[in-house]
Amino acid sequence: MSTGETQFQTGGGITVSLAASTVDGNAEIENLVDRLDEARGVLLSSSYEYPGRYTRWDMGFADPPLAITSRAQDIWVSALNERGTVLLEPVYEALAALGSTAGIVDLRHEPGDAAGAVVCRVERADRRFEEEDRSRQPSTFTVVRALVNLFSCDDPHLGLYGAFGYDLAFQFEPIALTLPRPAEQRDLVLYLPDDLLIVDHEGGIAQRFRYDFAVDGRSTAGLAGGGARVLYEPDFELEASCDHEPGGYAAGVRAAHEYFARGDLFEVVTSQMFSEPCIESPAELFRRLKEQNPAPYGFLINLGPASAGRGEHSVAGESGEWLIGASPEMYVRVEGERVETCPISGTIARGQDPIDDASQILALLNSAKDESELTMCTDVDRNDKSRICVPGSVKVIGRRQIEMYSRLIHTVDHVEGRLRSGFDALDAFLSHTWAVTVTGAPKTAAMMFLEQHERTARAWYGGAVGKVGFDGSLNTGLTLRTIRVADGHAEVRVGATLLWDSEPDEEESETELKASAFLDAIRRPRSAAATGVAASVPSDRRVLLVDHLDSFVHTLANYLRQTGATVVTRRAGFPTEEISADNFDLIVLSPGPGRPDDFSIGPVVRASLDAGLPLFGVCLGLQGIVEYFGGELGQLSTPMHGKPSAIRILGGHLLDGLPKEFRAGRYHSLFARRSEVPDSLEVTAVSLDDDIVMAVEHRELPVAAVQFHPESIMSLDDGVGLALIRNAVDRLVPGWRAG
């Protein structure tokens, strides 16, 4: 549905006609993903929410009219279809107006596959630039800035979209390059779209924006779009490999230690690259990543073949190149005068469940090493902003905040500043090249170390992807957690932040963990994702759960049902004759408030034993069993309500297969006095912090009990709670001897 047409003029005198329409966002996104298997273009997709930082959105396009490509100092602005030819002349004139004083040399038109290109070279300046002006020295960004000025307008969506390679940093901060670069490596691929899909998932709005451009009597209206097609072709003969042998990455950590010891480096982020044969298409990999690894900066970018957009004729059969990513880290975002970054440093693996996650988060937040990592990153980031921001405006607005991803938990800082007069979004972009979280500190020394010690050139890794808006905005994410697909295979490069406290083998393991989610996306179909819910095995066992007005009884019943048993939960106070009349196989005494006598637990125990039925008690249930057999109860000086304790196993059968020490949750004030536990009962577990009886078993009868709550979230570590309940059902019902 059309929502209207508008017309405006850019800062360079180009007339833009805009037609907007409402579309089916999900259907259009799926269609675009499929098109990007063959057509050049970009899809940027945020599938991660964080209040005040990230929302869910998609923006993308295929078959753009213009591409801007660079390698070292050489730059090509190429028309990719007939519509792009209309824009080449104003591009040429904008660059010609800058001339050699801005470093633009060898400016010319060249023929190409579609309709030619404007080609130039940017020469390094032969004069000194003060540090405050370093971002204005001649570089590839001189051309990018000229294009932004040519198309400058208030439209919030029109801009240059694509990928920025790692080597662009050396135009800002030159160092000696020692690693070989492949001939096909490109440092920059940006596209100017004319047909944009924008989906705001939070607002529930999906729109298509179509642009026509007119200048000097020529217009794109009515001209054909489209572009060349390159199909991905897997190479089935390739084998998986890594640019480091096992232990090689750890050896690099040890080498870095020498630099830390001398004070040459404070931290450095070294990487290793894994290569895999890849039979799936880039579109399928993107869908897998989005499903398995939601992230604020997801992307699928078809960069075209290496020769495309460089004023050259494509070679028959030449492979394309794609970037598919799920980056967790904002690189630089600029809106108006506000500059934002979100440095990530400090990493720990996700737990097995939310409770385990909480323990991992505490471990991460309590790690002095991880705190030091992030502190150094943020100090360097603040320095990057101070070059181009208003004095006093650079502030940390979020400190060591937790962000959780599919397999990792990170600590993140949120830093902002306000641009000084005379600086723009590209100055902010350049002043941060590249983020300390992918290089190190001091930054120049770290990049020199990486050039000397990494095994292969980074190419796109550690650079950025995103959008340079013609309205002065900028939104970019770091090129991390990215799959590069080319030549029939897929590459995944991952790194870790090293500092003096780093343990070499642990850092190597961290890189392997980071890579695992993306290697899985290459290897494993979407439908193979595990649900994490274990199926119960049906059995013919019937369990009576006696409810002592407890608030956790239904969770306990749930655990019992997970063993496959049929569970009947019956409020205490029923006639005890029902115990023998209803064909139960196990009687379970629940927790509850008060004392055992308040619920007449003794008669229930007597009736169960008379019926020859095994008995299992939890919390109040343990207290009732101990009293029945002649033991005495005491009262804790400090109640243990909703508090965990470490439990040590002393013996018995009920706790077989559990760790010798484990964590469990307690909700009680009464306890069984250990010195008064009768000889007929064996104490099989105690709490480590206060030496309270935590489990008992009858020496001859199938009777057992625990003081802690196996059904509590505090008892989830290593699946201890459910394992205990399985033991109770499997071992008590047949009796100890048979179990």
Stretches found by the model and what they are:
Residues 284, 478, 598-606, 721-725:
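Charged helix-capping and loop-helix junction motifs
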Residues 567-573, 645-648, 667, 685-689:
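Short gly/ser/thr-rich secondary-structure transition/capping motifs
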Residues 582-663:
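Cysteine-nucleophile active-site neighborhood
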Residues 3-5, 79, 682-739:
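C-terminal and late-domain segments of enzyme folds
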